[in-house]
Regions:
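Compact, glycine/acidic-enriched structural inserts
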Residues: 86-126
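A surface-exposed partner-binding patch
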Residues: 1-83, 87, 122-123, 136-205
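Hydrophobic alpha-helical interaction segments
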Residues: 125-135
Length: 205
C-alpha cells in the first residue's frame, strides 16, 4: 500500500514509499531513531485526533501536525503545515528540526542519528557526526540513499542545514490549556530556552 493513501504531502510520500519498499533501508532509518509508521498507522492518526491530547494534554499547537514516524522514546516526527519537519517529545518538548523533508532526510541519513536535540553547538555536532559514522553498521544502504537523492555530505554544510531548520520561524509551540504548561525547547526544560536563544544568536552572528 502506498503512502498516497494518506494525507501527507507528495514529497513526504515519495520518501516514505522509497524507504518502506526496501527493508534494509527501513531498518537503517530505524537504527537512526526514525521508525517510519506504516500507511494504516498514519491513517489512524488522521482519523482520530485524540492522539494529540493523549500525548500532549489539552493544548493548542501553532501548526497543523501530521505524524509520520516515531523515535525509541515514543516521541513523534511530524510534518508541520505540509512543509516543515518537527519533533514532539514525550516530556513536553517540541520544535522544528528541518525546513522541509529533503533537509530532514539529508541530516538524518548523513548524521545517522535522530538525536537532533543534542546538537546545540557545533562542537557537539562534529563529535556526534564522527562517532555515528564510525560506529554505524548499515552505511552502505544509506550511502546509496544519499547518492540517489544528491544529498549534501560535508559536515559543516549539514550543520548549516540543521541550524536553518532549528532557527526557522515561527517556532513550533504548543500552548497549554486547562492548567497544562506550554511546550518547551528541544534543548531542555531548565536552560533549554537559553540554549536555543544562544544557538540562534551564534547562527546569526
Amino acid at each position: 500500500m502506498s503512502y498516497d493513501e494518506t494525507n501527507l504531502p507528495r514529497k513526504v510520500v515519495k520518501y516514505l514509499d522509497e524507504i518502506n519498499s526496501d527493508k534494509n533501508l527501513k531498518d537503517a532509518f530505524y537504527y537512526c531513531d526514525v521508525d517510519i509508521y506504516d500507511v494504516n498507522e498514519i491513517i489512524k492518526f488522521q482519523e482520530d485526533q485524540l492522539w494529540f491530547e493523549d500525548m500532549c494534554g489539552p493544548g493548542e499547537p501553532n501548526y497543523d501536525i501530521k505524524p509520520f514516524a516515531r523515535d525509541a522514546s515514543g516521541g513523534l516526527w511530524v510534518v508541520l503545515n505540509n512543509e516543515k519537519i518537527g519533533y514532539i517529545g514525550t516530556e513536553g518538548e517540541c520544535g522544528i528540526v528541518a525546513r522541509n523533508i529533503d533537509e530532514f532526510m539529508n541530516v538524518v541519513s548523513t548524521l545517522k542519528s535522530g538525536f537532533i536535540s543534542e546538537l546545540s553547538d557545533e562542537k557537539s555536532f562534529y563529535k556526534i557526526f564522527e562517532e555515528q559514522n564510525k560506529e554505524y553498521k548499515s552505511s552502505g544502504v544509506l550511502s546509496s540513499f544519499i547518492e540517489k537523492n544528491c544529498f549534501e555530505k560535508d559536515p559543516s554544510k549539514i550543520y548549516h542545514i540543521l541550524k536553518l531548520g532549528m532557527t526557522a520561524k515561527p517556532f513550533f509551540l504548543i500552548k497549554g490549556k486547562e492548567g497544562y504548561l506550554d511546550s518547551y525547547s528541544l534543548f531542555g526544560l531548565d536552560d533549554g530556552q537559553k540554549s536555543l536563544e544562544k544557538f540562534i544568536k551564534d547562527y546569526c552572528n
